């Protein structure tokens, strides 16, 4: 087997060897381009009773009300997010070419940025990186978003997004926003409350 591989490389031209090396490096770079832990942020200390009612909370060390990450997303919030933010969430692989094409057309037509075309996966990457919005950064977000789709399930990506999305002031994440604005847990949000929170990060 080893001799066959060696003979294969011997018969390749220099150009093909260089090209194969570049492709190999790109594939390896893509595999390892995403950090094992996306978010490196402090979280609030939260105390709840056995029924999940909030008894108290302590602000995170960076001055943000950021409750610990969620493992699931309430159904109403999930549906509102997909309706308002990313209708093709369950059908794309991190990047939605149709949304990007539509956003590009709208931006050119209006001669200013009116739409970003980002999927929820791309927005999750943006929240994790917290970099300036530039064309180069958008390309990086697209690459990392496709990589995240290979690593995590759609539900895990949604949970990452709702746990770290900004909801105004120093309120970060769905749980902190739900208690801050409505005085109850995210599981008890009404449709109207869910719709409001779904569009608030924008």
Map each language-model feature to its residues.
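Juxtamembrane regions of bacterial inner-membrane/periplasmic proteins
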Residues: 1-202
């Amino acid at each position: 087997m080893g001799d066959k591989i060696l003979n294969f490389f011997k018969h390749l031209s220099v150009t093909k060897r260089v090209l194969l090396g570049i492709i190999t490096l790109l594939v390896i770079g893509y595999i390892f381009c995403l950090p094992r832990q996306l978010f490196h942020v402090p979280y609030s200390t939260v105390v709840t009773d056995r029924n999940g009612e909030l008894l108290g909370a302590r602000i995170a060390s960076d001055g943000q009300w950021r409750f610990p990450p969620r493992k699931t997303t309430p159904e109403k919030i999930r549906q509102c997010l997909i309706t308002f933010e990313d209708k093709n969430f369950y059908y794309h692989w991190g990047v939605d070419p149709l949304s990007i094409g539509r956003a590009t057309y709208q931006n050119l037509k209006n001669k200013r940025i009116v739409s970003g075309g980002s999927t929820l996966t791309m927005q999750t990457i943006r929240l994790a990186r917290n970099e300036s919005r530039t064309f180069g950064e958008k390309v990086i977000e697209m690459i990392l978003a496709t990589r995240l789709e290979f690593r995590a399930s759609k539900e895990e990506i949604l949970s990452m997004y709702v746990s770290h999305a900004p909801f105004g002031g120093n309120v970060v994440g769905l749980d902190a926003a739900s208690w801050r604005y409505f005085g109850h847990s995210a599981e008890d949000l009404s449709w109207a409350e869910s719709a409001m929170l779904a569009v608030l990060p924008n």
